[in-house]
């Protein structure tokens, strides 16, 4: 009998072991769909991005008009741009839900998989930031100025670091050119990191909602979970196409329809919605260096998740107190996102400060305490 190429061919064998014959826990829920959705998001963003890059000019005098030209004169250029811009929002929705799932079900105990995932998040944030600068509208320019300026908070090397990032003494043509180069390069780095992420995941196998070892009871990924993933793709593309076709500018900033002008500062500089929670934490601290450190800590704190796990149970499925705390954390993040979009005035300042404090207290202090308390309750 001839060997099946799916199982013997060096490349097809890898695909087979990752997507077809992959042993999968039988009880994983829809929360396990987001990994594959993120993969589809990445492919979509790279394809639409490549098409946009063929019509884009990375020059301060031409960038804004080249984007307008793409939307007006290129066949379906408006659609490609709308899919790319709104695809980024969907990418972040999926990654935040994916991280939330990881925190809820204790997936962070697979340390290598979790750490590569956090590095992926940081790479995605960097890619989205440099990408937002490319249309060279008002918010692009001032967003780049404000965020890159944060590096100047570092003692001694700060100012040198900023000028090195800018390629001059302000955000100008060299900045735009290097940001375009980075925005083109980083998605391929993300694709490589994704393979590392998957390699580490397939070393241990997937976690499941009960947090139990399911090696004795696994089923092949295809045909049991492939249709489930397909349904996920359809349910993701529906809102994306609806957004791109009916309300493409809903999540954008009207300021970005004005070409960048270094002489006019917008009344309220703010990043895209998916960075608002971190921006609110940054703004909550009156000291510049303190704000930058809090901003970095708000994301880097995820690296500590495996060390803050004190419970004897892996998931929160049977831990009502931890569940309550988890949903308080989610609500807190939504409050931070809302505060980040508001002007810097009372009562938003104090709400932001309290929510920022609550964010770190919940993750660093309350989760370990509640975990230890639930261990005690198991003895009764």
Swiss-Prot record:
Component of the ubiquinol-cytochrome c reductase complex (complex III or cytochrome b-c1 complex) that is part of the mitochondrial respiratory chain. The b-c1 complex mediates electron transfer from ubiquinol to cytochrome c. Contributes to the generation of a proton gradient across the mitochondrial membrane that is then used for ATP synthesis. Belongs to the cytochrome b family. Its cofactor is heme b. GO terms for cellular component: mitochondrial inner membrane; respiratory chain complex III. It is a multi-pass membrane protein. Pfam families: Cytochrom_B_C, Cytochrome_B. Coiled coil: none annotated. PROSITE patterns: CYTB_CTER, CYTB_NTER. The cytochrome bc1 complex contains 11 subunits: 3 respiratory subunits (MT-CYB, CYC1 and UQCRFS1), 2 core proteins (UQCRC1 and UQCRC2) and 6 low-molecular weight proteins (UQCRH/QCR6, UQCRB/QCR7, UQCRQ/QCR8, UQCR10/QCR9, UQCR11/QCR10 and a cleavage product of UQCRFS1). This cytochrome bc1 complex then forms a dimer. This is Cytochrome b. The chain crosses the membrane at residues 34-54, 78-99, 114-134, 179-199, 227-247, 289-309, 321-341, 348-368. A ubiquinone binds at residue 202. It comes from the Eukaryota. The keyword Transmembrane applies. Heme b b562 binds at residues 84, 183. It is found in: Mitochondrion inner membrane. Binds 2 heme b groups non-covalently.
